[in-house]
């Protein structure tokens, strides 16, 4: 995505408002380490496929080892997004997600960060006292084996 990359806004999430989100700006945040125990726990609870829950079977998979569920990866992304990008004082929720893709597997030991591009900011047509911020979020993987 185009835009100037910065590691922060002028304001922290504790004092960030609609006007602080500038269309075209790019921000990088993170990092969070993917822990094997958490991959196994999440897989067992929510996505019990062999390459998420069984290290030996996962070695024989196309991935060559244990990988995090895409939903686990999405949850880790959401943690970074919530901690660093979303306003803590003015966020009223989200109208949804346009697209979600998993392009690369995430392995235990990888470190994730996010790059967020502000695609659009606009006033709500139905509630003009509120703003809508459309963002493009990428998960960056350091240590990726794939």
Residue ranges and their predicted role:
Residues 1-22, 102-146:
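HotDog/MaoC-like acyl-thioester-processing domains
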């Amino acid at each position: 995505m185009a835009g100037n990359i910065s590691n922060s806004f002028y304001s922290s999430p504790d004092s960030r408002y609609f006007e602080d989100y500038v269309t075209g700006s790019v921000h990088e945040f993170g990092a969070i380490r993917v822990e094997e125990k958490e991959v196994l726990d999440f897989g067992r609870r929510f996505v019990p496929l062999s390459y998420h829950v069984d290290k030996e079977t996962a070695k024989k998979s196309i991935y060559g080892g244990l990988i995090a569920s895409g939903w686990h990866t999405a949850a880790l992304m959401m943690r970074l997004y919530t901690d660093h990008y979303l306003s803590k004082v003015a966020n009223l929720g989200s109208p949804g997600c346009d697209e979600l893709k998993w392009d690369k597997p995430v392995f235990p030991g990888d470190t994730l960060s996010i790059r967020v591009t502000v695609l659009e900011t606009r006033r709500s047509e139905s509630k003009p006292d509120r703003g809508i911020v459309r963002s493009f979020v990428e998960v960056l993987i350091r240590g990726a084996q794939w």
